[in-house]
């Protein structure tokens, strides 16, 4: 079996305790769906694709739609993910996490702990529901913080930003999500 690069993937997983609601999947765009490496070719094969979308992994759309979860954008694209990304992926409009300004105390604590700036907002948005979060900025500090601040199962999955979501990522996410449903 091939080894994952250090720090890529990984999860914090806890047992489900009678929590029956559909899990959430928080999805970043830049990195997981728009890798920073690669050929720069659109998966659609369109010649008139906007340059910033030329690396979009359109084959990920149907695979995301098949996962047993509620998809939620967790990206700086905000609502633009619904107008510019979702149609290329064949996805409907999805809920979007908004990014509130942290307090000065939160910002200092996040820097001291090494938390991704999205972590608190993702946990707040989940509101106690099980969730998976796919992002290229997740660290072990985020996994530890979520483990101690979120009561439900959570899987924080770091994607290699140069490759985007891979077959193995989809297999591991799907397996984890199916265990919850």
Question: Model-predicted segments: where are they?
Answer:
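C-terminal cap/substrate-recognition subdomain and adjoining C-terminal extension
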Residues: 84-181
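Residue-identity detector for glycine
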Residues: 7-10
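Alpha-helical substrate-recognition element adjacent to the catalytic core
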Residues: 14-108, 178
């Amino acid at each position: 079996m091939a080894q994952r690069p250090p720090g890529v993937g990984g999860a914090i997983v806890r047992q489900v305790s009678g929590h029956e609601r559909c899990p959430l999947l928080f999805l970043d765009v830049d990195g997981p769906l728009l890798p920073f490496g690669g050929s720069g070719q659109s998966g659609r094969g369109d010649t008139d694709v906007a340059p910033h979308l030329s690396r979009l992994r359109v084959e990920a759309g149907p695979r995301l739609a098949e996962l047993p979860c509620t998809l939620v954008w967790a990206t700086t694209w905000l609502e633009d993910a619904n107008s510019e990304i979702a149609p290329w992926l064949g996805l409907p409009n999805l809920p979007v996490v908004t990014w509130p300004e942290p307090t000065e105390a939160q910002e200092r604590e996040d820097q001291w702990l090494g938390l991704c700036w999205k972590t608190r907002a993702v946990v707040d948005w989940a509101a106690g529901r099980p969730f998976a979060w796919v992002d290229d900025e997740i660290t072990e500090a985020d996994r530890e913080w979520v483990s101690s601040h979120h009561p439900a199962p959570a899987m924080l999955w770091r994607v290699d930003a140069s490759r985007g979501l891979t077959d193995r990522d989809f297999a591991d996410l799907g397996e984890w999500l199916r265990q919850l449903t």
